[in-house]
């Protein structure tokens, strides 16, 4: 399979037939734009889909996903879910996962990464070095927590 040069002289991959969705509220964000640019450069059919524009359908024996009222027919998803819509974005992503669509990050992975204490626990349990961390809720425990980690930075 050869490549062809686009109008900028960059080499372009032949069409792969892959239908990709980038879940993002911000199609103009740099990170989203770059993903789209690179996908197009490789001949991927890519669309930015706003996670807030999905309808999730659960019926006896099936789940369906609609984006802006139309069937969501993609082969892969790259989620770019902002912190402010984590719960909804993860609900959409999990629903898409139920359809067997490949996702670059799972809903569970996104939730675990947003919970910094849980993320540290997972890393430590898998023998990946993490800074010594103490989690407290009561202000009376803060001084002891600071001592436990060896003082303030």
Predicted segments with their positions:
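Active-site nucleotide/adenylate-binding loops and adjacent lid/helix of ATP-dependent enzymes
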Residues: 10-25, 29-37, 46, 66-72, ...
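N-terminal ordered "arm"
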Residues: 42-48
């Amino acid at each position: 399979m050869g490549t062809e040069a686009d109008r900028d002289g960059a080499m372009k991959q032949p069409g792969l037939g892959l239908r990709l969705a980038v879940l993002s509220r911000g199609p103009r964000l740099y990170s989203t734009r770059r993903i789209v640019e690179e996908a197009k450069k490789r001949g991927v059919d890519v669309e930015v889909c706003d996670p807030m524009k999905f309808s999730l359908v659960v019926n006896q024996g099936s789940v369906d996903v609609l984006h802006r009222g139309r069937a969501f027919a993609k082969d892969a998803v790259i989620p770019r879910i902002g912190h402010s819509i984590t719960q909804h974005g993860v609900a959409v992503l999990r629903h898409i996962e139920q359809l067997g669509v490949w996702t670059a990050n799972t809903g569970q992975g996104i939730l675990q990464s947003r919970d910094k204490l849980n993320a540290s626990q997972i890393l430590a349990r898998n023998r990946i070095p993490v800074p010594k961390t103490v989690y407290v809720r009561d202000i009376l425990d803060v001084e002891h927590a600071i001592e436990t980690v060896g003082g303030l930075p």
